Curated annotation (Swiss-Prot):
Keywords: Cell projection, Cilium biogenesis/degradation, Cytoplasm, Cytoskeleton, GTP-binding, Microtubule, Nucleotide-binding, Nucleus. One of its GO terms (molecular function) is structural constituent of cytoskeleton. One of its GO terms (cellular component) is cytoplasm. This is Tubulin delta chain. Pfam families: Tubulin. GTP binds at residues 143-149. It is found in: Nucleus; Cytoplasm; Cytoplasm, Cytoskeleton, Microtubule organizing center, Centrosome, Centriole; Cell projection, Cilium. Its main location: nucleus. The gene is tubd1. One of its GO terms (biological process) is cell projection organization. The keyword GTP-binding applies.
Length: 451
């Protein structure tokens, strides 16, 4: 089944480019420990999901590019064309010469409705090229104007136009010390509205990705492109073909459907986070060897202690020996991270020898789901990107409670003093809308806190 990707704003277009580029690099890499037949099928499934193939063999993305300023879209199109491996459909893009000025309300209330018909027509054309539509994957920032405001509006339009299709929003969480003074307003408005329209939100935190670049990749002068490459690698590690059960004879052809079924058992819990191991520079990788037991031991502790990268894991955090009674006090003392559901994706050599029983411990999960329902394993012997062995954990858990509480608190303090509220009311977002937003997010915080 095919996925139509919608790249929204500067951030969405730059991350989208790196995402498609890494998919194509992976397609052309050595099959590693896969048979030729297996590798051929892997390539077929990847192409079917994210590209359509022209008669000449060129791969063209199933994507729509949207930005209110033309510069980034133009650069993205030309970079893809120069890659020689893939390209965008140049007729599947929309840009204007006037941005949203980092104002969510301007994007949501003005530019979104104004350009809705044109953008949705581009989406429709991509949908019509799919033999079977698996759903939509949007890539956007939470804190800006076009990506967040217009992106949120277009997400609502997608939900209205395709009510039976799955909709996954990948959102970039802003730096804690961002340059945009109203980023907290933009972020809470984005989150609360997406929660109504989207089936799930896959969240990447800029601060964490920046640390990965610095501490794990050993990059000295970190650029936005470095950050985007890490995000793209993590996304690729989810979406490239895998076997979704021990008995599976073929690679999964419905990634969004399988993902939602595994991770979103209840519409109150839609926040997904991602942990990837290993992540390191090519220089370090040349001198490193890995075994599955070591990788999975680290990944499990990252989950339990809510460590978002393998550096600096708190090994003192343990699951409670008693169910729910101890969980609250343990969380307060040691930041134990309770999960709704987890999906582990293993790729590479000797993958059949990996044991994941530790991820099925009942204390890791909320009591209203059995571990067999809450934990899912996907795998493939084909290595991904440059790693002989790699593991990804997609988690619906309490991982975002602290950053969410922080961003809501900062936004509330600004709102209580009416700071910058006039910039939103003049475009049509009134104070009542803000209050509804705070109520929605407080409910999400309460739901995850009480797991």
């Amino acid at each position: 089944m095919s996925v139509v990707t919608v790249q929204l704003g500067q951030c969405g277009n730059q991350v989208g480019y790196e995402f498609f580029d890494i998919l194509c690099s992976d397609l052309h890499s050595k099959p590693g420990h896969s048979t030729k037949r297996e590798n051929d099928y892997y390539q077929t499934v990847c192409k079917e999901q994210f590209f359509h193939e022209e008669e000449c063999g060129d791969l063209v993305t199933r994507a729509v590019l949207v930005d209110m300023e033309p510069k980034v879209v133009s650069k993205t199109l030309s970079m893809a064309g120069r890659s020689g491996k893939w390209k965008y459909d140049i007729s599947s893009q929309f840009s204007q010469k006037q941005g949203c000025g980092n104002n969510w309300a301007n994007g949501y209330c003005v530019h979104g409705p104004k350009h809705q018909d044109i953008v949705m027509d581009l989406v429709r054309k991509q949908v019509e090229k799919c033999d079977r539509l698996g759903g939509f994957f949007t890539i956007m920032s939470m804190a800006g104007g076009t990506g967040s405001g217009m992106g949120t509006f277009l997400t609502r339009c997608l939900r209205d136009a395709y009510p039976d299709s799955l909709l996954l929003n990948q959102v970039i969480w802003p730096y804690g010390t961002g340059e945009v003074i109203v980023q907290n307003y933009n972020s809470i408005l984005t989150l609360s509205h997406l929660y109504r329209s989207s089936d799930a939100l896959l969240v990447h935190e800029n601060d964490i990705i920046h640390k990965v670049c610095s501490q794990l990749m050993n990059i000295k002068q970190i650029s936005f492109r470095d950050v985007n490459k890490v995000i793209a690698h993590q996304l690729g590690s989810i979406f490239q073909p895998v076997y979704t059960s021990e008995e599976a004879l073929h690679y999964c052809r419905n990634p969004l459907g399988e993902l939602m079924e595994c991770l979103v058992p209840h519409p109150e819990y839609k926040m997904l986070g991602l942990r990837n191991i290993p992540q390191m520079s090519e220089h370090s990788l040349a001198y490193s060897t890995f075994n599955w037991n070591g990788l999975l031991k680290h990944l499990r502790q990252m989950l339990i202690a809510n460590a978002k990268m393998e550096e600096g894991i708190n090994w003192h955090v343990r699951p409670p020996s008693q169910p729910t009674a101890e969980k609250t006090s343990l969380r307060k003392e040691l930041q134990f991270n309770t999960s709704v559901a987890n999906l582990a994706i293993l790729r590479g050599k000797d993958v059949q020898t990996a044991s994941l029983e530790g991820f099925r411990d009942p204390p890791l999960y909320t009591p209203w789901l059995s571990p067999d329902d809450a934990f899912t394993l996907w795998k493939t012997p084909r290595a991904f990107n440059k790693y002989e062995k790699s593991a990804t954990l997609v988690s619906n858990s309490q991982f975002l409670l602290k950053p969410l509480d922080n961003i809501v608190g900062k936004a509330w303090n600004m709102f209580a003093s009416k700071a910058y509220v006039h910039q939103y009311t003049k475009f049509g977002i009134d104070e009542e809308e803000f209050l509804e937003t705070f109520t929605t997010l407080e409910q999400i915080i309460a739901s995850y806190t009480n797991l």
